[in-house]
Amino acid sequence: MNTHFTAAVVGGGPAGLAAALALSAAGCDVLLAAPPHRAHGGAPDNRTAALFAGSIALLKNLDAWERIASHSAPITGIRIIDDTGGLLRAPELVFTAAEIDLDAFGWNVPNSALTAGLIEVAQRTGSRVRLHSTAGIVKAEIGASAVTLTTHEGATFTAGLVVGADGRGSLCRQAAGIGTRSWTYAQSAIATSFQHGRPHRNLSTEFHRPAGPFTTVPLKGLASSLVWVERPDEAQRLAALDEPAFRAVLEERLTGLLGPVGEITSRAVFPLSGLTAEAFGRNRVALVGEAGHVIPPIGAQGLNLGLRDAATLADCVADARAAEQDVGSAAVLDAYSARRRIDVTSRIATVDVLNRSLISALGPVHLARGLGLVALKTLGPLRRIAVREGLAPASADADLLHPDGARRLSERASGAARHSAA
C-alpha cells in the first residue's frame, strides 16, 4: 500500500475536498485524510452556502457541478433594506445579475449536497485521489523533504506538500509554526431554513438592522435559508423559542415579504469571530479555508474564499510541476501566500467595516453607510463595479475559476502552454 503522496489534504469539508480535486487536476497524486462522510444517518446538515460565479466555475471544472446543481437555487438579485431606524434611511437597493450580463450572481447550495457531490467525484478519480477515513490527524512532523502525518488510528503517511483544511483550530497550521490574528464580535448568528407562502423570485434579501444583518437566501421552491445576526443573549433567547413563537417573530422581521412562514428546520447558534493567518503557506504546509481565514457569515464570502484558495494553490503547484520543482518548496508556498493575501485581506476588511457600521452608535458612521448605499443606487457604473468586484475580485485569477479552466490547468502543469508560447 502506497504511503507517500505528492500532496496530502487534511480535512474533508468543501474547501478540503475541492483542494484535493484541484491538485489532482494539476497532476498530483493526493491523499485526502478526513472523517468518514455520513451520507445517511446522524443529525442532518441544514446549512447552505451561496456560491458565486467563480466557485461555480471551479465546481464545473472539477466535474462536480452536475451532481450538485439539481439541489441548488439561483440567486438572480440581491435586495438591501435599511432597517436601522436611523435619521438617514437609505433607499431600498436592488442589484440584478442582468446588470453585469450574468444569468445569476451565484447559487445557494445545501452543504450536504456540495460535500456529497465532491466526494462522489473524488471516489471516481481512481488512484489519483485516495480517500483515507480517519478520526483525525494527531501529529504532523515537518521534515526536510516531506511531512509525516500520523492518524488517530496509528497509520502514517508522507507527502511533499500538506494542505491544512482542518478548520480554525488547524493542527497543520500549528505544526508549520504559522501564527494567527483573531478577534471576536459581540454578536451571534442564528442559522436555519424555512418554508414560506410567497415566491422569493430568486432574490436574496438583506435587512440592515442595528444588531447586525438579517439575511434570507433563496432555496429551491418556496423555501429560503436564513442567517440572523443578533446580540448573543438575544440570539440564544430566539433560538430557544418553540416553533410557533419563533415563526411569529420571523414573520414580523420579514414584514410580509415572503408571506406566511411554514416549516422551520433546526436552528443553530454560533458566535461571530474572525481569524487570519500571518501566512497562508510555510514549511511544506499550505492553508485553505478556515485554517487560514475565518470571516463572519456576512456577504457570503467565507466558503467562496476557501474555494479560491483551492484553485490558486492548484495554479502554484502546476507551475512548480511544469518547472520540475518541489511542490512543497518555500518558493511555491511564498507564491501561494502572496497571491491569496490581497483577496483575503480585502474581503475580511470589507465585511468587518460593514458589520461594525451597522452596530456602531456613532451618527457619522451611519451617515457614511447611508450615503454609500445612496451612491450605489444612483450611480450605475459604480454599482456595476462594486458588484463585479464583490463576486469576482480581480486578484482572484486562478485557472479553475474560469470556463475551460481544467484544460488550462493541465497545460500549465505539463508546461504545454509555456512551450506553445515560446
Describe every region a protein language model picked out:
Residues 236-328:
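FAD/FMN-dependent oxidoreductases across multiple families
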Residues 59, 146-267, 272:
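Conserved FAD-binding catalytic core of PHBH/FMO-like flavoproteins
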Residues 5-32:
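N-terminal Rossmann-like FAD-binding beta1-loop-alpha1 element of flavoenzymes
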Residues 24-47:
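Glycine-rich FAD pyrophosphate-binding loop
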Residues 315-422:
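C-terminal helical "tail/cap" subdomain of flavin- and related membrane-associated enzymes
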Residues 3-4, 71-175, 183-188, 243, ...:
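Conserved N-terminal helical subregion
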Residues 45-85:
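N-terminal FAD cofactor-binding segment of flavoenzymes
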Residues 32-33, 164, 288:
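Generic enzyme active-site microenvironment
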